């Protein structure tokens, strides 16, 4: 170790070992000194963090500084950094009211960062405090969103539908947003939805408070998917096309695009609007990466991998699938690997595709993801058709199926 104007350690692990071996009062004293010598105006966030580490108990002043710093921390280190500041603010807050409000804010930040267990723990902390009706409805909404993003299983539609109904008299706009989340959850859950299938959610959404004039992007999308779920594709097509264009190309806030872009992508997919589907998903992947929102990034990366496979860019598809799998492992998320099934089938790897279909079907059933089961059923039929075509009399001897041309258009490179 060298001590001068800076303290230098021979290896970063030595620094960690020294820090962790120090007694708690010594660490707190050092953090307090560092806070005192850190400029309040030039680096308020670092100062707040050192003050928090130096605190021996609740401190409302430090908690308020951490809360103010959370937004700046997000800009530098992503949503996980913002969640860390807010969680520490909760720990330093003694008054029940402010503690509950900060816990709810920290829970939503943790949800967006993909820390689902932490989000639920913080929601429980918030629920134990004196919340008003809107805050309690938002706790229910958070639980539904965790169920959607963590597993997309059968529990999520009912939770989100209940939250939407609770929100109607409290916040009409948020209620409409929640109906859109519930519709997405119902599509994923399919036949495994405990309650709140696509038609039920669509009917409830059509009776929700009307959209403002002019409507927000999510209002256009909700009206389109609600008609899709009740009256069918032909009736919904004009509204879904308009919504898809707005989400793919329009002026839309990053938060809005990430939250409801998946539903817009489903609408474009239902209409086989591949151009809007690709543009929309690519835009959301880029936004989620920049914002560090791992929960949403995992879904969009897998979707982009599927599109890349359909468009013939198998290398990009494989890279995107690997990235999505890594995110899923890091966040503890279980989502059926649709993209891997599509890639194996389009490569002509019949044995691999069949094995994946069986594994994905089993996992999708266990997770309550009806969309995954339905998707695999369609892939199994497609594989049977491809197998019959590739083993018939028209197949050229010695030419592997994976190298025969397909009718899938190549629409350009996909970022990995």
Where in the sequence are the language-model features?
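Short secondary-structure boundary elements
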Residues: 1-98
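Short, polar/flexible loop-turn hinges at active-site or ligand-entry regions and domain interfaces
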Residues: 21-23, 150-151, 167-172, 190-193
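Amphipathic alpha-helical repeat scaffolds of TPR domains
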Residues: 45, 136-140, 174-187, 214-226, ...
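Short coil/turn linking the two alpha-helices of tandem helical-hairpin repeats
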Residues: 55, 144, 151, 183, ...
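Helix-coil-helix junctions within alpha-helical repeat/solenoid scaffolds
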Residues: 64, 69-70, 80, 84-98, ...
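Acyl-donor-binding surface of acyltransferase catalytic domains
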Residues: 179, 183-188, 194-203
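Alpha-helical transmembrane segments and their interfaces in multipass membrane proteins
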Residues: 248-251
């Amino acid at each position: 170790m060298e001590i001068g104007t800076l303290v230098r350690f021979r290896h970063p692990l030595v620094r960690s070992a020294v820090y962790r071996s120090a007694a708690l009062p010594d660490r707190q004293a050092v953090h307090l000194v560092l806070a005192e010598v850190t400029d309040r105006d030039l680096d308020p966030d670092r100062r707040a963090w050192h003050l928090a580490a130096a605190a021996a108990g609740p401190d409302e002043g430090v908690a308020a500084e951490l809360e103010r710093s959370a937004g700046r921390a997000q800009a530098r280190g992503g949503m996980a950094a913002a969640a860390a500041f807010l969680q520490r603010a909760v720990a330093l807050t003694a008054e029940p009211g402010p503690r509950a409000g900060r816990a709810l804010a920290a829970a939503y930040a943790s949800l967006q960062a993909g820390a689902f267990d932490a989000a639920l723990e913080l929601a429980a902390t918030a629920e134990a405090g004196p919340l008003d009706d809107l805050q309690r409805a938002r706790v229910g909404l958070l639980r539904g969103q965790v169920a959607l993003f963590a597993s997309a299983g059968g529990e999520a539609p009912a939770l989100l539908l209940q939250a939407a109904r609770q929100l109607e008299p409290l916040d009409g706009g948020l209620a409409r947003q929640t109906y859109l989340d519930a519709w997405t959850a119902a599509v994923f859950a399919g036949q495994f939805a405990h309650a709140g299938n696509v038609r039920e959610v669509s009917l409830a959404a059509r009776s929700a408070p009307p959209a403002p004039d002019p409507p927000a992007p999510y209002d256009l999308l909700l009206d389109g998917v609600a008609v899709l779920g009740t009256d069918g594709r032909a009736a919904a097509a004009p509204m879904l096309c308009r919504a898809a264009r707005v989400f793919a190309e329009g002026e839309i806030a990053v938060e809005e695009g990430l939250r409801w872009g998946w539903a817009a992508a489903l609408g474009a997919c239902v209409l086989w609007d591949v151009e809007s589907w690709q543009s929309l998903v690519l835009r959301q992947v880029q936004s989620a990466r920049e914002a560090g929102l791992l929960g949403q990034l995992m879904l969009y990366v897998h979707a982009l991998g599927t599109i890349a496979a359909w468009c013939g860019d198998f290398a990009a598809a494989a890279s995107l699938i690997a990235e999505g799998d890594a995110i899923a492992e890091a966040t503890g998320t279980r989502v059926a690997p649709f993209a891997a099934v599509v890639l194996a089938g389009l490569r002509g790897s019949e044995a691999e595709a069949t094995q994946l279909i069986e594994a994905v079907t089993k996992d999708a059933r266990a997770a309550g993801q009806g969309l995954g089961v339905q998707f695999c059923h369609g892939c199994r039929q497609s594989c049977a058709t491809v197998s019959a075509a590739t083993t018939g009399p028209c197949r050229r001897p010695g030419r592997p199926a994976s190298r025969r041309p397909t009718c899938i258009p190549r629409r350009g490179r996909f970022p990995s």
